Each structure stands twice: as structure tokens, then as C-alpha cells.
């Protein structure tokens, strides 16, 4: 049995990663690897579908037990990828899609050099801000923190194998599907 392939999607908050990954997952019939997080669910998010929602204390126990392939504290909340889920799926020959922060993407690449890292971004800062405000889920303080953090996240772009500028959802979906189906690096 051949090993599967690992695809890591990262980029600033508001770049459209979640939207595109959800559509690609539906179209290709592959499952997004579900990350764990200590943050509260957003409207419409479901436990075990969008994330494993756990307490900060439980997350810290899992860190101590070395249960994560990668993890980070982003905007005051923990996010991480459980090693067991990814390793089992790769052994079964599945294509695994991770949607994680840029620091986590680099951590994964260090542990799995064959991973395909795909960086999502918007055409400009104004579009990013428009999308963040359009969510209607974050306070002004959180939006400003996310915008400030996006400048740091953009510095990681060169560490990624491919870049998708998400100006239009359908084109971004097609670009990601092409990378997954063709193994294009």
C-alpha cells in the first residue's frame, strides 16, 4: 500500500482558506484533517466536523503528551493537528488536507519534507480587511490584531511550495484542485 499525500493550506485570517478547503473537500471527496482548537465555535461550526473544540487545559495536556504534529497559539487560542489522525490516513494511502496557520505549516514541512505547502492570500490588505469585517464575528480589537498579524504571516510565503491569490473563490478552488489532483509543487 502506498503512502498518501499531505497538502497544507495556510495564510492570513480572511484569505478564504476555510471556504475554499470546504468546497474542494466536497468536490474531490476528500476529508479535511480536523484540527483541535481551544477557541469557541463560530456560528455554524460543528464539533468533529470543523474542529475538535477542547478546553485550553485539555489542549495543554495533549501538548505534554506529544499528541500534536504541530500546534500554535494564534490570537490567544490554541490550534493543533493531532499526529494520530494524519499518520493513520497517510498509511491508508489517503490524500490529507490540513488547514493550519503558517507557523504550523513550517513545522509540518520540517517533520514531513514531502508535504505540499500551499499559501493563500488576498490581492491586497483592503480586501483582507473587508473579508474580516464581513464575518461579523470579531470585535474591532480582534480585527486589528488579525490585520497586524497578517503582515507577519505574509513573511512566511517564501517557505511555501505554491501560492494561491484568492481573488475569486471558484478560481482558487480550481487552483487547489489542480495541485491536489496533479501533485503539482
Swiss-Prot record:
Alphabetized PROSITE patterns for the sequence: GUANYLATE_KINASE_1, GUANYLATE_KINASE_2
Subcellular locations according to the entry: Cytoplasm
Pfam families tied to this protein: Guanylate_kin (PF00625)
Binding, ATP: 11-18
Reaction catalysed by this enzyme: GMP + ATP = GDP + ADP
Domain of life: Bacteria
The protein's Enzyme Commission number: 2.7.4.8
TM segment ranges: none
A cellular component annotation (GO) from this entry: cytosol
Main location: cytoplasm
InterPro entries noted in UniProt: GK/Ca_channel_bsu, Guanylate_kin-like_dom, Guanylate_kinase, Guanylate_kinase_CS, P-loop_NTPase
Domain Guanylate kinase-like per the UniProt entry, residue ranges: 4-181
Keyword set, alphabetical order: ATP-binding, Cytoplasm, Kinase, Nucleotide-binding, Transferase
Protein purpose: Essential for recycling GMP and indirectly, cGMP.
Similarity comment text for this entry: Belongs to the guanylate kinase family.
Protein name: Guanylate kinase
Species lineage: Bacteria, Fusobacteriati, Fusobacteriota, Fusobacteriia, Fusobacteriales
